[in-house]
């Protein structure tokens, strides 16, 4: 896959180890017009902290799918997890090679095309689920996750199609179809959390910067 130049530009401009949204515990008190880039990076740190709080205690090995530039993998390593990473992006592969020098094994592949060499306790899809085709994605997940293992997805999903044709409607997976397909491949929902309000200041902040 060619380089995603939008994500590359973002990472080089913001100088954050993360490519995902920020997370605010009290979003109603946030004034986006007063954002600084440092505050945004801290909020991105809270995002992965909150996400990792959902990982069950019996998880030791994690495949970071759509691994970006390694921020999530670094956090997982700091918490004692054994981490490997996957992304089809050439630039992200280069970043991982420079950052980890082989400490974190990196697979340059679409998840749908991934041929796992082993099985993992957990597959993490942090804002990458929407890039993965639903049916082949769950088929690969079933082959990649050990029996009794987990998939932790954090992304935006479509609850209602307003017919607007906006990018977020086109990009998001239909949540009902996504979950029904998961069940088809033997996975069931354990826990969910709607963090829409917690992450919305990210978009408000982007507007303020523009």
Positions of PLM-derived features:
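Class I SAM-dependent methyltransferase SAM/SAH-binding core
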Residues: 63-113
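A short acidic, Gly/Pro-enriched loop at the edge of an enzyme's catalytic core
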Residues: 113-123
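Conserved class I S-adenosyl-L-methionine
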Residues: 152-177
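Conserved alpha-helix/loop element of class I SAM-dependent methyltransferases that forms part
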Residues: 41-58
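A short SAM/SAH-binding and catalytic strip from SAM-dependent methyltransferases
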Residues: 122-135
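Short alpha-helix
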Residues: 171-192
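N-terminal, positively charged/glycine-rich alpha-helical extensions of SAM-dependent methyltransferases
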Residues: 1-30
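A short glycine-rich, Lys/Arg-flanked "PGG" loop and its adjoining helix->strand segment in the class I
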Residues: 136-150
């Amino acid at each position: 896959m060619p380089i995603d130049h939008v994500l590359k530009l973002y990472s080089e401009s913001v100088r954050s180890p993360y490519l995902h949204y920020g997370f605010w515990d009290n979003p109603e008190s946030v004034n986006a017009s007063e954002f600084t880039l440092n505050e945004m990076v801290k909020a991105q740190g809270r995002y992965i902290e909150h996400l990792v709080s959902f990982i069950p205690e019996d998880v030791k090995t994690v495949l970071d799918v759509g691994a970006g530039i390694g921020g999530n993998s670094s956090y997982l390593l700091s918490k004692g997890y054994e981490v490997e990473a996957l992304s089809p992006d050439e630039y992200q592969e280069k970043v991982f090679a420079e950052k980890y020098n082989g400490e974190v094994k990196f697979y340059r592949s679409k998840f749908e095309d991934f041929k796992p060499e082993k099985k993992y306790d957990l597959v993490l899809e942090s804002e990458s689920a929407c890039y993965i085709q639903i049916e082949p994605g769950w088929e690969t997940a079933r082959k990649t996750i050990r029996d009794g293992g987990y998939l932790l997805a954090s992304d935006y999903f479509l609850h209602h199609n307003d017919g607007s044709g906006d990018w977020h409607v086109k990009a998001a997976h239909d949540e009902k179809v996504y979950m029904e397909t998961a069940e088809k491949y033997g996975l069931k929902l354990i826990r969910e959390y709607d963090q829409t309000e917690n992450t919305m200041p990210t978009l408000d902040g982007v507007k303020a910067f523009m």
